[in-house]
């Protein structure tokens, strides 16, 4: 196969693929409602994460809802023997992953360091609700972070003035977008971030940044939605390409090494399996993140490996932010997926210090 053609096809396919208590800790009707929601969502009771459970934290499952009425499922992590009101962090990502993968690892690590954390599945994915399944939306997914903040604000074990968020990969960009619109969020970390609106509109490395190329994508996707309506079935874009050809781009090989091997595979992960619905890309072509990034007053830390194919997303987004409470942490030698689960690579000490400084 022609290498150039293969890489273009793989990259286009990958963009398609990437795309038991209540939240209130009092025993009230909210708890009964949440229990009913959990039963409706059929949440698993087993520990099915891609990482071992820590003895330093307590774990349970909770649910909450966004303002579109979608019920989201989350894992709650709290430090063992914690008391009083804690600073809290909501975590999600990577884009096309589930809470049993990278976001859960981050949440557990931060709970070990004294924070109450939740790792949640976005709308339409994982154990969360929403139909049809495997849909991504720049609006609804941004709302998901604010819905997580709603949940945390109403917990009696959370200090409502000390709430932060952390997004990984595509959810890093979504986290920053959420923080722009939600001043309740006092601190945001974007780890190995993507700007999903930019990559969908412009292609990787801005290689498809013309009106003609965008219109070609639009035409292809609206043709697909016509076919989806006719068939009554939403075509999936496919997860990470498998089997992996030798001439795949290095970053696709890195994704394969995480999503398609025992290291990070999960049965509910879109990227590990069949990916997003193809038409999920469409709204990202018509929606631009960070137009008001210079108005974001709260603290932001962007963490990126300098060997990541996605490094330019972090670098360029950081340049849009204003204020001395913004920080860009470069992890020397790290690629994109090293920051998914690399406990010796992810700068947890810096992340902990950042949240301690800004959630006080």
What are these regions (language model features)?
Residues 177-260:
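Alpha/beta-hydrolase-fold enzymes
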Residues 296, 302-304:
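Short beta-strand/loop motif that positions the catalytic acidic residue
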Residues 96-108, 122:
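The serine-hydrolase catalytic nucleophile loop
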Residues 39-84:
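N-terminal cap/lid segment of alpha/beta-hydrolase-fold proteins
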Residues 109-129:
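Conserved alpha/beta-hydrolase
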